[in-house]
């Protein structure tokens, strides 16, 4: 079930370019292949964690709008819960190991707490809620960058902001159910 879920919801066609964009935004201009590959790998792990959280939180709504999804049809979501929990722990460990400044782990734990609280408390989709969910992408840039944000704040934070606007535009364009969408529900 987990393999089918990952194949369905973590399409390499979408997530590899997104991971590369996140890694480039966090690069501080160092686009050496080794750094880019490690950063993109970390980005993929973070994206998988937060995609699975999004899908777990949306399972009830997806039962109506996307009844064919693996997570909706599954008798138990325990494998996905275990996977996302293990990824959260692994990502925290990677953030600690990669960044001695504490920036990465601080931003990551704040993101985990904020989104976890939002998922637990939200009653439905709102424009503010969708903006909050999209803010995970610039936060992920800072998590990947870690202490590099201290030496190149304009590059990294500017890139993170540009990435936010790109994912916002994508959300407006591709998800007619989003309160942010042109023509979507309000």
Show where each model-derived region lies.
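Multi-pass alpha-helical membrane architecture of UbiA-family
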Residues: 1-186
């Amino acid at each position: 079930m987990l393999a089918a879920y990952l194949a369905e919801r973590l399409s390499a066609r979408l997530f590899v370019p997104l991971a590369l964009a996140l890694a480039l935004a966090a690069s501080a201009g160092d686009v050496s292949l080794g750094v880019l590959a490690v950063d993109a790998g970390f980005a993929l792990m973070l994206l998988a964690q937060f995609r699975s959280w999004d899908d777990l939180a949306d399972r009830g709504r997806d039962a109506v709008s996307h009844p064919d999804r693996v997570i909706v049809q599954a008798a138990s979501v325990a494998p996905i819960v275990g996977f996302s929990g293990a990824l959260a722990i692994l990502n925290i460990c990677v953030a600690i190991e990669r960044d001695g400044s504490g920036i990465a782990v601080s931003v990551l734990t704040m993101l985990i707490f904020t989104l976890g609280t939002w998922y637990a408390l939200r009653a439905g989709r709102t424009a503010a809620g969708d903006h909050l969910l999209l803010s995970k992408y610039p936060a992920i840039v800072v998590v990947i960058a870690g202490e590099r944000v201290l030496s190149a704040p304009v590059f990294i934070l500017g890139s993170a902001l540009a990435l936010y606007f790109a994912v916002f535009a994508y959300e407006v364009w591709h998800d007619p159910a989003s309160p942010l969408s042109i023509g979507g529900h309000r």
